[in-house]
Amino acid sequence: MELLPHEKQVVEYEKTIAEFKEKNKENSLLSSSEIQKLDKRLDRLKEKIYSDLTPWERVQICRHPSRPRTVNYIEGMCEEFVELCGDRTFRDDPAVVGGFAKIQGQRFMLIGQEKGCDTKSRMHRNFGMLCPEGFRKALRLAKMAEKFGLPIIFLVDTPGAFPGLTAEERGQGWAIATNLFELARLATPIIVIVIGEGCSGGALGMAIGDVVAMLEHSYYSVISPEGCASILWKDPKKNSDAAAMLKMHGEDLKGFAIVDAVIKEPIGGAHHNPAATYRSVQEYVLQEWVKLKDLPVEELLEKRYQKFRTIGLYETSSESDSEA
């Protein structure tokens, strides 16, 4: 597994403890209580390091090559999954994976953005950058879910919509805008979870829902830290400063009422214990579905509308208040 800079101290300590335990089998150098003390010291070290991460270090965790992707969540959460392909207009976009899913006996339409896990699959998936047909595919499946009365799960993980000339020629902006319009009035519950990168319109085109949650180390932003640094300072190396200023992680976005919940990850990130992450996401999905399933359609749509209508509203003091 690829090591991130802040993980090196933890890994070195783990190796040292493993060596002690191996030698201890032969010579009994340490008692069981002393070994337990070493393990507890390791746990404290992990807690200290991972509770004091900078925003940029959390972006690195979010981008870790071993971080679970949509296809991993499908395998880890679903008892059954039937994939559906194509947008019925141009072609199938491999950057979107969607279909009928069964989770704990309940049927959903699960639609997610997929980056790939190795060089070959990343090229095939276009690194998770959707073309217009990807957004149209997602909308087609969402409307199918509405028709059959199925709740929808959107898994968001993209560095942004594909910015190439061919995508623009096929109406990239129009496809994203259409999704925003149509998803806002879709008469079925929609649960959105940002599992990795949630960047710009590429993320937003599949992130209109009744509840929006994020994994602890995922991010949701109008632009990547590198893109922001290039624009503001003409220096992409200032990505660490940009990551802090963008307020792109769950605790900040929950405070701004942009997301509703932050799902805890295992210590070190989802890639350290994927199975535990799948369980946490599954529990959240089922918990929210129970809250949404019995709402009248009119109330569901009104709450969804008000949720997004109020994002970005703020109050300023009047002149009389400031004079007082």
Curated annotation (Swiss-Prot):
Pathway: Lipid metabolism; malonyl-CoA biosynthesis; malonyl-CoA from acetyl-CoA: step 1/1. Pfam families: ACCA (PF03255). InterPro entries: Acetyl_CoA_COase_a_su, ClpP/crotonase-like_dom_sf, COA_CT_C. The keyword Transferase applies. It is found in: Cytoplasm. Its main location: cytoplasm. NCBIfam families: accA, AccA_sub, PRK05724.1. This is Acetyl-coenzyme A carboxylase carboxyl transferase subunit alpha. The gene is accA.
